[in-house]
C-alpha cells in the first residue's frame, strides 16, 4: 500500500508521531496528539477534546436530520458508544459507532496525505479554516452522490484528491506519457469469463497449507515475535493467541502502552493507551473483518466464512501471478483474496468496511510460511489501514496449547506507561 511522501516525511521526522500513527485505530482511525491521548486514557468514557472534522453520510438527503438518519442508515448497534458520546463538537456525524467515525477520519487523512494537526488545532475542538472547508466539501460530495447516484457512495474524497490537498485541474504531460500507475479496483465484481472456479482456488489453498485433516488437528497456537510500526526505528514484542475455529487475540507491547486486538467468536474490541476510547467496540465491517482475520488463522472453514464467491481474471503481486477471489460476509461487506497461482498459498487480503465517506480498506500481506504441526502458517504479515501499518514477524509458534478463555475476553483498558 503506497503512502504519500509528504505524510511519510511528517511521520519519520519524529518517533512520537510515528508511534501515534502506528497505534492508530485498527478501524482505520487517525492518530492523535499525546495530550489528547493521555486525556482519553484517563477519562474512560467521558468526552474528550477531539473535535475532528464531522462528515455527513454520502447518502444522507440533508444535514438537519443528520443524527437520526445516521443511526437509521448504518443500523448502529445498541449499546456501542456513539461518536457524539465520545467526542466534543460533533456537528454532523452523530449516531454512528466510534469505529466508523474514526474510519472516516482515516479516509480524510489518506485522501489528503495529511496528519491530524494539519487540519486540527492542538485542542482539536476549534473550527479551523480547513475544517470549515472540509464540511463544505462533504456537502458537495453528498450532493453529487445524491443527485447522480441515488445516494450511493460512488464519489469520495479520494476520487479527486489522490493524496493532494487540492485536486489537479490540468493533466501534467509527463504523467500522461510516463510510467502508468495501477490502481487496484475496489468495486464488487462478478465471476469473470475465463477465470478459474472459486472452489478450485479454495481447494488448492486448503491443500497447500496442509489439507483438511491436518487443519482439523490444529486446534490452537500461540505465537511470539516482534511488530514494527509504520515509520520504523524500533520493534515491539508481540503475542498472538489463536483458537479454532474463530478466536484470536494480538497484543503488541508498545513503548507507551499495550495495544490489544481481540475477537472472541462473536464480538471484537481494540484496547490501546493512546486512542480516544480506551476500549473500542468493533461494529459493522470492522467486526466482519476481525471475524475473517480470526478464521484465516486456521482456515479450515474459509469457504463458509464468506459467501457469493466469485473469481476475477488472474493478476500479479510483486512479480508473481495470483488468482483473485472475492466473497461477501454476512453483514454485506466484501473482501478480496489473492492466492499465489504456483503455490496456492494466500498472498493478500483486502477487506472493506463501509463508512460515512466511502469504504475503509484494510490490507494484509502474508509471507514466510512455515510448517506448524503439519500446517503452513505465515510467520510474517503486514497489517495496513488508512492511517498506519504494522509489520509482524513471529520467531516461534507453539501448536495445540491450552489457552485460557480470558485471553479472548473483552480486554481491560490499556494502562499508559
Residue spans of the language-model regions?
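N-terminal mature ectodomain segment of secretory-pathway/periplasmic proteins
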Residues: 203-276, 306-313
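The canonical Cys-X-X-Cys-His
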Residues: 113-123, 154-164
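Primarily the internal scaffold of c-type cytochrome electron-transfer domains
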Residues: 66-67, 71, 75-77, 85, ...
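Acidic/charged, solvent-exposed loop-and-adjacent secondary-structure segments enriched in E/D, K/R, S/T
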Residues: 270-297
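N-terminal secretory signal peptides that target proteins for export/translocation
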Residues: 1-11
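Signal peptide processing junction and immediate N-terminal pro/mature segment
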Residues: 24-52, 56-69
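Gly/Pro-enriched, hydrophobic low-complexity segments
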Residues: 254-257, 318-415
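Mature N-terminal segment immediately following signal peptide/propeptide cleavage
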Residues: 77-114, 118, 198-225
Amino acid at each position: 500500500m503506497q503512502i504519500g511522501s509528504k505524510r511519510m516525511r511528517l511521520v519519520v521526522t519524529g518517533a512520537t508521531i510515528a508511534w501515534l500513527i502506528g497505534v492508530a485505530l485498527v478501524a482505520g482511525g487517525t492518530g492523535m496528539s499525546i495530550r489528547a491521548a493521555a486525556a482519553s486514557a484517563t477519562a474512560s468514557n467521558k468526552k474528550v477534546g477531539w473535535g475532528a472534522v464531522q462528515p455527513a453520510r454520502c447518502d444522507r438527503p440533508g444535514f438537519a436530520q443528520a443524527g437520526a438518519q445516521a443511526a437509521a442508515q448504518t443500523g448502529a448497534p445498541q449499546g456501542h458508544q456513539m461518536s457524539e458520546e465520545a467526542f466534543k463538537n460533533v456537528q454532523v456525524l452523530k449516531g454512528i459507532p466510534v469505529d466508523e467515525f474514526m474510519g472516516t477520519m482515516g479516509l480524510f487523512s489518506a485522501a489528503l496525505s495529511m496528519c491530524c494537526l494539519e487540519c486540527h488545532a492542538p485542542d482539536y475542538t476549534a473550527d479551523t479554516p480547513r475544517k470549515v472547508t472540509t464540511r463544505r466539501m462533504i456537502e458537495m460530495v453528498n450532493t453529487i452522490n445524491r443527485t447522480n447516484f441515488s445516494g450511493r457512495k460512488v464519489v469520495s474524497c479520494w476520487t479527486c484528491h489522490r493524496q493532494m490537498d487540492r485536486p489537479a485541474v490540468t493533466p501534467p504531460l509527463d504523467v500522461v506519457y510516463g510510467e502508468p500507475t495501477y490502481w487496484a479496483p475496489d468495486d464488487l465484481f462478478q465471476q469473470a469469463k475465463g477465470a478459474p472456479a472459486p472452489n478450485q482456488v479454495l481447494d488448492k489453498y486448503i491443500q497447500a497449507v496442509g489439507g483438511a485433516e491436518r487443519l482439523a488437528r490444529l486446534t490452537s497456537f500461540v505465537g511470539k515475535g516482534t511488530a514494527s510500526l509504520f515509520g520504523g526505528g524500533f520493534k515491539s514484542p508481540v503475542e498472538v493467541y489463536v483458537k479454532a475455529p474463530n478466536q484470536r487475540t494480538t497484543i503488541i507491547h508498545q513503548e507507551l502502552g499495550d495495544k490489544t486486538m481481540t475477537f472472541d467468536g462473536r464480538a471484537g474490541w481494540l484496547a490501546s493507551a493512546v486512542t480516544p476510547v480506551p476500549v473500542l467496540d468493533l461494529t459493522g465491517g470492522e467486526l466482519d473483518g476481525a471475524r475473517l482475520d480470526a478464521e484465516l488463522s486456521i482456515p479450515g472453514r474459509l469457504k463458509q466464512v464468506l459467501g457469493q464467491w466469485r473469481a476475477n481474471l488472474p493478476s500479479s503481486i510483486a512479480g508473481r501471478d495470483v488468482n483473485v477471489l472475492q466473497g461477501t460476509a454476512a453483514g454485506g461487506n466484501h473482501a478480496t483474496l489473492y492466492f499465489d497461482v504456483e503455490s496456492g498459498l494466500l498472498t493478500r487480503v483486502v477487506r472493506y468496511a463501509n463508512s460515512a465517506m466511502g469504504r475503509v480498506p484494510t490490507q494484509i500481506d502474508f509471507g514466510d510460511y512455515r510448517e506448524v504441526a503439519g500446517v503452513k502458517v505465515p510467520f510474517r504479515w503486514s497489517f495496513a489501514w488508512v492511517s498506519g501499518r504494522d509489520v509482524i514477524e513471529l520467531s516461534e509458534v507453539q501448536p495445540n496449547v491450552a489457552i485460557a478463555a480470558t485471553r479472548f475476553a473483552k480486554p481491560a483498558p490499556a494502562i499508559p506507561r
